[in-house]
Amino acid sequence: DTSEFDPLANKEYTEEQKQTEEQEQKEFLSHTTTPALEADDGFIVTSASFAQSTPSMSALSGNISPDSQTSDPITKAVRETIIQPQKDNLIEQILKDLAALTDRDLAEQKRKEIEEEKEKDKTLSTFFGNPANREFIDKALENPELKKKLESIEIAGYKNVHNTFSAASGYPGGFKPVQWENHVSASDLRATVVKNDAGDELCTLNETTVKTKPFTLAKQDGTQVQISSYREIDFPIKLDKADGSMHLSMVALKADGTKPSKDKAVYFTAHYEEGPNGKPQLKEISSPKPLKFAGTGDDAIAYIEHGGEIYTLAVTRGKYKEMMKEVELNQGQSVDLSQAEDIIIGQGQSKEQPLITPQQTTSSSVEPPQYKQQVPPITPTNQPLQPETSQMLQSQQVNPNLLNTATALSGSMQDLLNYVNAGLTKEIDSNKQIDLIKEAATAILNNEKSDIAEKQANIIALAENTVNNKNLKPDAKVAGVNAVLETIKNDQNTPNLEKSKMLEATVAIILNSENLEPNQKQQMLEKAVDVGLSLKDDASRAVTIDGIKDVVIKTNLLSNTEKQKLLGSVLKKGVEAQVLSPAQQQLMQQHLDKITAEQIKKDTIKKVNDILFDPLSNTELKTTNIQAITSNVLDGPATAEVKGEIIQEITNTVAGSSLEAQDKAAIIKGVGETIATHSDTSLSLPNKALIMASAEKGIAESQTNLPDRELMTKGLVDGIYEGKGGPEITKAVSSGIDNSNINDSEKEALKKAKDAASEAALDRDTQNLTEGFKGQNIEEHKPHDDIYNKAREVINAVNPVIEALEKSKEPVVSAEERIVHETSSILNNISKLAVEKVNNFRAMLSPNGNLKTLAEKKEESIKKVDELVKAFGTKSSTEEQQSFIKTNLIDDKTLSKEVRLQTIDKLLQEQKRAEAIENPSVKTEDVRVVSGKSKLKPISKDNPDIEKAKMVVGRDRVNIKGNIKIMGALMNARDIIQSENLNKSTPIKRE
């Protein structure tokens, strides 16, 4: 038997088929292909003709694990047939280069490193991810034969994958051409609905064909290619419509926007694997490398050089960054977009007129910037991206006959850069260096042979060359770039709007450079703003400021604090120059506020993490510290929405920490209590509810397991009840669950946990209320004798006089007349006071006095108590009732203590009884049970009138909270009144 089994294709190969396959591989390697056939939009994938200009897709089951080990056959096939063979060939070339390396110790060290790692991991992920090995990888990639092999492996590999897993080959849900439908309103917009193999919609895919003013891209050999048309596809980031997986494999288009031949097709592939909730998650991206972008803006299109040709990919710079961030998130890895930025930084403009130069990335210290070979991928893009230094072909020796910049520019821009760099190297006087740069800028703008696009491209190249030149000191770099900007300002031939584009692109070069300090970037940016504000017309000035603002916001090489400073400077200058409309000022201020909020959020989460991971603090201390942070956020100047976002990050961080579940729940409880108890004057009730919903959303969307999330949700509710939060706050927890990006079963589980916590809290409140009444005889009457009280008043009044008299017995040295006078005065005072008190006492005992019998006093007290209780009943709100208690029962001393205490006892009785229990009609109409549902269910069919309810307290279960507050106020008032005893009396001293 001469057949072989191919595990990838899951079928047997005869010897004849094997030879045919090998022959096809040889054809790819030698580039002796069959006549090129162009695929059309209606083409169906077959084994004989696989490449199509339209995207291909499949809806499959399977997932990919965080450790990059996947069970999905398509993702696995891409790795095994494309990525791993490319790695193997690359390592083989690296080993050859090491064998020829002069430094034998280094060569042996790297050889051992490769061999040892290969025994553990054949993918050599660590080796390829180590920046220290970049020079060996780059050198290997310069080999033309290796480049040819890598490109061939990619083309043949995609053919194998697409054929093996195509629907036409019988693979369930396999690759098939997209059936685009044109939008009626515009022929350049197309869409298609992507469904899984069960027929459920996964997403709607949109394609836009962009027909732009031609712009140029430089190939590795220095030749330029014009781009006039490309397409953008809105790759989905998150999918939540249906379960399943999806692979979108989008063919790269030629420079003119047309379809490639079948034997040269390469693809940008997005792998969406089934996640824990069943929905597709973006787990991996496969694309040729190095991937470059036609500009610095998020709308810049991606392109590659493959087989000596330029191809555009259907992804923009902004979409690529967004996808990479989602890939890292779904792989459980940290996101460091600054690394991705090293690959994709470029210079240029917006879609209206991109400016693309050969230098598409930020170089570190090259002199001059040099082109770099562009090759296919060697690692999947979900692995850490390594910085790539953009290079040009090695410059030739500077021609000694090039006497000035204008002469140099007559050859090429590269000749001009060579001339400038030679002069910067030779000249050590910084002033002369700056003059040379200014001379070069003038030559570029005065070159009559160049159109405006070429002038723009050359000015940007000169600015980048200045920023990255290692022979310039930092201050000289600032002065050099400022000289370029000043030259742009003074040029009389360049239209203002074109100057605006030059300024914006130059600022992008400045801010995205790793060779400048923040203060140097600040100086250059302010100069660019000044030049922009000097333009002749308002429109150009406004466009310049707005464009520079966008560059500041989009750069990834600045911290939020640095962005705040730069954006604030731009805003200030724009306002002072009165070139920004109120709407533009407001928009820029909104961006500034957003950056500020992001910085606050970042700083806050850092503090939270420091607390969570502090080994010396226990849970109680962690809770206290995080409560303090929460309170600071709530007191801050940010909007309620921003505060909610920050609180959501806090709860999400706590939930995702490695602490025990009960410890996390305790901390979350503290956060809930802090929000609930926060001052209503500084944070309105609706805003509290909004923030509480965000707090729960942070818990619900955390990556921790469901039981832990349920426990933390209960903790949040407990915190609300501890903080005496109202119904709106508790209800907000449910809102946070509803708005969370989790599946329905998880939402239901969290809502049950929330309801259970509410019921338990209500039970505790009821039990505490019952305990508060134990041992109290509310009906007990405690009369006091008025006569005794009046007598005591006389004693208290006379006592100070007696004390003064006793003091007068002390030895004196005054004259006899003075002693007699003072003694007489004291005796007169005693006599008057005694007569007054005795007369009052007699008046009380007289028939016309106000001394009543006990029966009369009791009747009068009952009447007064009833009046007070009735007046209390007219107060509808808890606040009014609390005010009544203080004013009429505590502060009003004209009422007897007995009347006030009886009133309190009666009010407590009414609160305890809760009249609704005695009124069945009220019970069935108004009462709500703990779960929050409005209808009560009978306990049994035999007793339909006995309804299952925890407690009835008026028209809303929330009134239980109000009743508890009133009862507390009444009990407190009772204690205060009872303390009004004889403790202020002073007993009569007796000898």
Swiss-Prot record:
Biased composition (Basic and acidic residues): 12-29
Keywords: Cytoplasm
Top-level taxon of origin: Bacteria
Subcellular location: Cytoplasm
Biased composition (Polar residues): 348-373
Region span, Disordered: 1-37, 54-73, 348-384
GO terms under cellular component: cytoplasm
Cross-referenced InterPro entries: Rickettsia_antigen_120kDa
Main location: cytoplasm
Keyword Cytoplasm: yes
Protein name as it appears in the record: Antigenic heat-stable 120 kDa protein
Source organism phylogeny: Bacteria, Pseudomonadati, Pseudomonadota, Alphaproteobacteria, Rickettsiales
Gene from which this protein is expressed: sca4
